[in-house]
A protein has these predicted regions:
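One-carbon transfer enzymes
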Residues: 1-192
Length: 192
């Protein structure tokens, strides 16, 4: 299966995917911030990457199609993608989110968990739909205790450890689903 990973920041989830999943699976990484850690990691790992501004979403779609990408992984992609993007890749875009969905959707999920005096949080991997952080959940992490002295930074580090654990599991799950869906499609074509 051919993966593309979209990143905006440090790229630790991207690097983890490359290292844990078969290396030849990640064929491309796209980042929307020119000087980000993800680009440096891609250089170090020998993964092709390019910087594309999010307003150039059509270019991103065309590039993903040209690279024959089977699965798009949003790993720290800090932009909402459009309905057209989602329609171009139906049920083949997944996102890792730093909360136990459906709690704390959106950009500041870790801060929301702290502010709401939750005793625990975690992370989720879900299919991307037009409604923000509302797609079917593929898997969730173990609960992570929120300590009284936790800050957004310390809690984010704890959550990222779990993201590194569950994102490859979610990719394997989706890979199996895509293969099953393709096999069923081939069988139905043969029946006609």
């Amino acid at each position: 299966m051919r993966l593309a990973v979209l990143c905006s920041g440090n790229g630790s989830n991207f690097e983890n995917i490359v290292r844990v999943c078969d290396q030849d699976q990640v064929v491309l990484m796209i980042h929307n911030k020119k000087e980000c850690g993800a680009a440096r990691r891609a250089d170090k790992l020998g993964i092709p990457h390019c910087h594309i501004k999010m307003k150039d979403e059509d270019t991103i779609i065309q590039l993903l199609q040209a690279w024959r990408v089977d699965l798009v992984v949003l790993a720290g992609w800090m932009r909402v993608i459009s309905a057209d993007f989602i329609k171009a890749f139906p049920r083949t875009i997944i996102n890792v989110h730093p909360s136990l969905l459906p709690k704390h959707k959106g950009l500041h999920a870790v801060q929301q968990a702290i502010d709401s005096n939750e005793s625990h949080t975690g992370c989720s991997v879900h299919y991307v739909t037009e409604e923000l952080d509302s797609g079917e959940v593929i898997c969730q992490s173990r609960e992570i205790a929120i300590r009284p002295d936790d800050t957004v930074e310390t809690l984010t580090r704890s959550i990222q450890k779990e993201e590194h654990r569950i994102l490859p599991l979610a990719i394997e799950h989706v890979k199996h689903e895509i293969q099953t869906r393709t096999y069923r499609h081939l069988l139905s074509d043969e029946d006609n």
